[in-house]
Design a protein with these regions (language model features):
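Receiver (REC) domain switch/active-site residues of two-component response regulators
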Residues: 166
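Acidic/aromatic-lined carbohydrate-recognition and catalytic surfaces
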Residues: 1-158, 162, 173-176
Length: 176
């Protein structure tokens, strides 16, 4: 993100009369949250910045500098699935192993294996349970019907809006 900050005047110097910039009025950032993959579409922490890109402080500076120039910031927000290393999913797997489906398991598409047809990719868990994972086993799907999940998503979006984000691109929610 520091590289973007360093080159903002080339994108938009904030003065419409100069003609020395590209006149950019929006920047869309692909996933920037912590993730074990190179593409960052399997988020482990929706409230932070992957160290490959900077810190929350760097992000705040980017937003501030962009807004000074009339540039909006759009974040890619991955709400269809998380990382298999996300703390909620790890807790959900533990709960399923204990035969409990009332806690974190409700955040994910965890059902008896018989629930899924043969075309649906899943992570097989214990007790004849599985979690839907259409993209890859490393990306378990959120249960978008769950009130707990929706409340968490409301917190996530509020967190980023409070930091000055102007909007979101919702990734892969059409899979739901």
């Amino acid at each position: 993100m520091q590289g973007i900050i360093d080159n903002l005047d080339y994108l938009n110097d904030g003065d419409p009369n100069t003609g020395n910039d590209l006149g950019v009025d929006g920047i869309w950032l692909t996933p920037i949250m912590p993730s074990p993959s190179y593409h960052k579409y399997d988020v482990t922490d929706y409230y932070n910045i992957d160290p490959d890109f900077g810190t929350l402080e760097t992000f705040d500076k980017l937003v501030s500098e962009c807004h000074k120039r009339g540039i909006n910031i759009i974040l890619d927000l991955v709400l269809n699935h998380a990382s298999s290393q996300h703390p909620y999913y790890l807790k959900a797997v533990e709960e399923v192993e204990e035969g409990n489906l009332d806690g974190y398991a409700q955040y994910f598409e965890i059902h008896p294996t018989s629930y899924f047809d043969s075309d649906t990719q899943t992570n097989y868990l214990s007790h004849a349970m599985a979690c839907e994972a259409n993209f890859t086993e490393e990306m378990p799907e959120w249960n978008l019907n769950s009130e707990k999940t929706r409340e968490e998503f409301a917190k996530i979006t509020k967190f980023w809006l409070d930091r000055g984000v102007d909007g979101f691109r919702l990734d892969a929610v059409n899979i739901f």
